[in-house]
Regions:
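Active-site loop segments of alpha/beta catalytic cores
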Residues: 1-30, 59, 93-337
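Helix-coil boundary/capping segments in enzymes
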Residues: 33-108
Length: 337
C-alpha cells in the first residue's frame, strides 16, 4: 500500500501540480490542516497611541504617523518619512531582520519536524512588500508621482528594500521554511493599480532576483495580492511566483483566472469574501467551492483551501464559515481520484 502523504508533501504536490492525495487545507474547523503559517515579530512603534492637540496619534517603526478618530486600532496614515523620495538615502529601515524576531519560528519548525506528519512551513517575510512597503512610507499619491518625476530615486529605494527582503529570505531558509510569503496588492476592484509596463520596469527585475534566490535556497514563493490582478498572473508565474493568495475571485471570474494561469500558478483561496460569503446561501457556498475546485484545482492540484482571517470585519457568519469548511473537506479529492 502506498504510504500516506505528509502534510508537507501534500502542499508541495499541490502547488507543483503533482497529484496530491487530496487538496491541502488551512481551515478554522478544528480538523487536520497542512500548513504552519509563520509570522515574525518586529520592532515596537516609535511612539504609541497618544493624544496630541485633540487627535490620537502613533508613529510606527517605519516612521509613519497614524491618526484615529474613532478609537480603532489602525487609523489613517497622515505623515510619511519619505514623502520626498529624493531623500531616500537618509532613510534607515527598521530592524525587522533582527534574529530575535525569528526565534519563535525556529522553535516551531524544530517541533514540527519531530512530528510523524510534518506540516508545510510557510514563513512570512518581515520585509514582505515592495509595492505596499514603498507607498506606506511615501504615501500613495507621492509614489504615483515618483514613477514619472523621480524614477531613478524610486528604483534606487526599491532596490534597497528588495535587498532587505532578500535578507529575510535567507534567514527564513536557514530556519527551515519550505516557502516564503510576501504581500503586494496590485489591483483595485475592477482594474490594476498601475499599468503592467510600470510593474515590469520597476518591480519585475526585483521580484525575479528575490524569487530566484528563494528557489535556489529550496523554497517556494507565495504572495498575497488582491483586487483585479488576473492580468498579472501569468507574468508573475513566469517571473517565479508559485502561489498567489487571493481573498476575492468573483471580480475577475474563476474561469477567466483559470484560463490566464491555471496549471502554472497555484491558488490559495477562500470562497470570495465580498460576494458569495456575504450574499450567498449555504447552498451557494457549497456550489462555489465545487466550481473553484473544478477550475483552479483541476490541474493535478493547484488549489489550497483557506478561510478569511478577519471574518467579522467583512460580515462572514459562523454558519457560512462552517459551510465553506465542510464543502472544502467534502470535495477535497474532486478531480484527483
Amino acid at each position: 500500500m502506498e504510504a500516506k502523504m505528509t502534510s508537507r508533501d501534500r502542499v508541495k504536490a499541490a502547488i507543483h501540480f503533482k497529484s496530491p492525495d487530496r487538496m491541502p487545507h488551512f481551515l478554522p474547523d478544528g480538523k487536520e490542516n497542512d500548513i504552519l503559517w509563520l509570522w515574525q515579530g518586529g520592532p515596537s512603534d516609535i511612539q504609541n497611541w497618544h493624544e496630541e492637540n485633540g487627535h490620537m496619534l502613533r508613529t510606527d517603526c517605519w516612521g509613519v504617523v497614524w491618526e484615529t478618530k474613532g478609537g480603532g486600532s489602525y487609523g489613517e496614515a497622515i505623515s510619511w518619512p519619505l514623502a520626498d523620495i529624493t531623500t531616500h538615502t537618509n532613510y534607515t529601515f527598521p530592524d525587522q531582520n533582527n534574529p530575535i524576531y525569528f526565534e519563535a519560528t525556529v522553535n516551531q519548525i524544530i517541533e514540527n519536524n519531530r512530528s510523524d506528519n510534518p506540516k508545510y512551513c510557510l514563513g512570512v517575510m518581515p520585509f514582505n512588500s515592495l509595492n505596499e512597503g514603498t507607498h506606506n512610507v511615501m504615501g500613495l499619491e507621492n509614489m504615483f508621482a515618483a514613477y514619472y518625476e523621480c524614477p531613478d530615486d524610486l528604483k534606487a529605494f526599491l532596490s534597497r528594500l528588495a535587498d532587505k527582503q532578500k535578507e529575510s529570505i535567507k534567514i527564513l531558509a536557514d530556519a527551515g521554511c519550505d516557502g516564503v510569503m510576501g504581500y503586494d496588492d496590485w489591483g483595485l476592484q475592477d482594474r490594476q493599480m498601475v499599468s503592467t509596463s510600470l510593474i515590469e520596469e520597476f518591480f519585475i527585475p526585483l521580484y525575479k532576483s528575490n524569487w530566484s534566490y528563494a528557489h535556489e535556497l529550496g523554497m517556494d514563493v507565495w504572495m498575497h495580492s488582491c483586487g483585479y490582478t488576473v492580468s498579472l498572473h501569468a507574468l508573475f508565474a513566469r517571473t517565479g511566483l508559485n502561489v498567489i493568495q487571493m481573498d476575492q475571485q468573483e471580480n475577475m471570474g474563476l474561469e477567466i483566472i483559470d484560463a490566464a494561469a491555471g496549471g502554472i500558478l497555484a491558488y490559495w483561496c477562500p470562497v470570495d469574501v465580498q460576494k458569495t460569503m456575504v450574499g450567498g446561501t449555504i447552498e451557494d457556498i457549497d456550489a462555489y467551492v465545487k466550481r473553484m475546485i473544478e477550475t483552479l484545482g483541476r490541474h493535478k492540484g493547484g488549489l489550497i483551501s483557506m478561510a478569511y482571517s478577519s471574518p467579522d470585519a467583512v460580515g462572514h457568519t459562523t454558519e457560512k464559515i462552517a459551510a465553506m469548511c465542510e464543502a472544502f473537506r467534502k470535495y477535497e479529492r474532486l478531480g484527483l481520484e
